[in-house]
Amino acid sequence: MVMGLGLFLLVFLLGLGLTPPTLALDNPRYRDFLTKHYDATPQGRNDRYCESKMRKLGLTSPCKAINTFIHGNSRHIKAICRDENGNPYGENLRISKSPFQVTTCNLRGGSPRPPCRYRATAGFRNIVVACENDLPVHLDQSIFRP
């Protein structure tokens, strides 16, 4: 009986440790944020990267004018919504304490109709996000740091 209770307690505690990431992925706005703005290990970070990535995400019908991809560790992005890596910024926004590697894809030409051609701008920037339940749900802007 004691062995069974100990095993149950161990499984319960392990379950608690696994719950937060699972709950985070259950948030549809956070999942949408990651889909549209997160790419851990980009290939290229050039115009071709932008055109391929935007097409894969379905952001080319109509052509989205601008989109920024954040690269690196998603835990650091989530930490912007807490004091760990973020500060209040404006009304209901948070700015990262540290810069992130990003690629911004800007639509070339004026037409929102495909084929979409993008110009890539790669760099390190502090990012501004809107948070919901300590999770980023909207990328407001990115700020170049000198």
Curated annotation (Swiss-Prot):
Family: Belongs to the pancreatic ribonuclease family.
Source species, domain of life: Eukaryota
Listed SMART domains: RNAse_Pc (SM00092)
Gene Ontology CC terms, in alphabetical order: angiogenin-PRI complex; basement membrane; cytoplasm; cytoplasmic stress granule; endocytic vesicle; extracellular space; nucleolus; nucleus
Database matches in SUPFAM superfamilies: RNase A-like
Disulphide bridges: C50-C105, C63-C116, C81-C131
Keywords: Angiogenesis, Cytoplasm, Developmental protein, Differentiation, Disulfide bond, DNA-binding, Endonuclease, Hydrolase, Nuclease, Nucleus, Protein synthesis inhibitor, Secreted, Signal, Stress response
PANTHER family linked to this entry: ANGIOGENIN, RIBONUCLEASE
Protein name as catalogued: Angiogenin
Active site residues per record: H37 (proton acceptor), H138 (proton donor)
PROSITE patterns: RNASE_PANCREATIC (PS00127)
Organism of this sequence: Colobus guereza (Mantled guereza)
Activity regulation details: Has weak tRNA ribonuclease activity by itself due to partial autoinhibition by its C-terminus, which folds into a short alpha-helix that partially occludes the substrate-binding site. In absence of stress, the ribonuclease activity is inhibited by RNH1 in the cytoplasm. In response to stress, dissociates from RNH1 in the cytoplasm and associates with cytoplasmic ribosomes with vacant A-sites: ribosomes directly activate the tRNA ribonuclease activity of ANG by refolding the C-terminal alpha-helix. In response to stress, the angiogenic activity of ANG is inhibited by RNH1 in the nucleus.
Positions of tRNA binding: R45, C105, I127
GO MF term set: actin binding; copper ion binding; DNA binding; endonuclease activity; heparin binding; protein homodimerization activity; RNA nuclease activity; signaling receptor binding
GO BP annotations, alphabetical order: actin filament polymerization; angiogenesis; antibacterial humoral response; antimicrobial humoral immune response mediated by antimicrobial peptide; defense response to Gram-positive bacterium; hematopoietic stem cell proliferation; innate immune response; negative regulation of apoptotic process
Compartments, as annotated in UniProt: Secreted; Nucleus; Nucleus, Nucleolus; Cytoplasm, Stress granule
Pfam families: RnaseA (PF00074)
